[in-house]
Structure formats: structure tokens, C-alpha cells
Amino acid sequence: MDELNSFIGLARSYIDSDKLAELDKILATIQNDLFDLGADLCIPDRDKNPDSLKIVISYVKNLEKEIDALNGQLEALRSFILPGGTKISSYIHIARTIARRCEREMIELRQIEESEISKEAVQYINRLSDFLFVAARYVNLKLDFEDILWVPGNNYKE
């Protein structure tokens, strides 16, 4: 989680446009959420008291709301896209891949008998990676960079 949070912070450090002010606020909220997630993950459910931080469904719903808001401003995808564009977008794509790795590791840990990682925590990190994908595209749009489309077999045409 620390690596993921750090890359989000790195992406935010490059935001200097008013066009991305709202996204910066969302990313700041996510950075705080990731600390909450870390607190949730470090204490097994059986050892938590009622006041312990836990990722609950409202975290997931808030992310889904933000995904819908940003995605509503983007053109529908016609192809897969390649990570890139602006520095901010590129760092957000790196954060997205780290979120996917965290998700895989959390799922693996959930399968261990003694693990007590909540389904809400896994849902949150899953939705976060989706949010970061949409956010990277949103950054490129707002900063007038086009998505880089994947062209299957482009390098091997005769």
C-alpha cells in the first residue's frame, strides 16, 4: 500500500493545472483511504475493537461515484490503450498496476485459512485500480493529450 500511495503522491506533485484541481482533491482522499486500508489490513478482524478502522462499503461506493463522474467526461474506448501521455497520467498508470498487484496479493492472502482480509477491502482496491485507469485517461483529456491506442500486430505488418 505504501508504494501505491507514494506513486499517487508523485502523480499529485506534478499537478499544477486548475483543470485537474478536482482530481487532485479526489487523489488526496484516496491517499487517506489507503492509510485506512493499511490500518484495516494490519489488524486481524478477531483482534479489532468496534473503533478500529475498517474499509466498509461506503469507501467502495464513493470510488464508484468518482469513476462514473470522470468516465462520463471521456469518449468510449474503441481499443485498448497503452499507458502513457503526460507524466501525471503515466504515474497514475504505474499506481494502477501497483493497485492490481495489491489486489492479487490480498486475494491470495484471503485464501490462506488464517487470513481475515475483508471482501470490502478487496473490493476497494479493485475499484481503485479501475478509478486510476479512468483518472489517467481523464488527465490526458484535460491536458490535451490523446490516448495512445493499441494497434494489434502493428509492428509486424508486411
For the regions a language model picked out, list residue spans one by one.
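Phosphate/pyrophosphate-binding loop motifs in nucleotide- or prenyl diphosphate-using proteins
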Residues: M1-E158
